[in-house]
A protein has these predicted regions:
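Catalytic cores and adjacent binding grooves of peptidoglycan-active enzymes
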Residues: 1-84
Length: 84
């Protein structure tokens, strides 16, 4: 994802980032700019990747909003699109 230019790490690999104001802002506003939290804590079984609060992925504002509204990670959203 980083090599494709679709992902950004907003902090060093540091779990304390989730306690910072920047993380709170991202959680509240990232979808407006088309970003999703790529590896949420409650989706580790689906993503097969440990929670990474610093790692965000660009999917576009429309898709980011829909994914957040549905409560889906990227893997779940792709599966949803394939079946609907």
């Amino acid at each position: 994802e980083h090599n494709l230019g679709l992902a950004v790490d907003f902090n060093d690999v540091d779990y304390a980032f989730e306690n910072e104001k920047a993380f709170t802002w991202l959680m509240e506003n990232a979808e407006k700019y088309g970003f999703i939290l790529r590896y949420p804590a409650d989706k580790e079984k689906k993503t097969k990747i440990k929670y990474e609060p610093w790692h965000w992925r660009y999917v576009g504002p429309e898709y980011a909003k829909e994914m957040n509204d549905l409560g889906f990670c990227l893997e779940e959203y792709i599966e949803y699109l394939k079946n609907n």
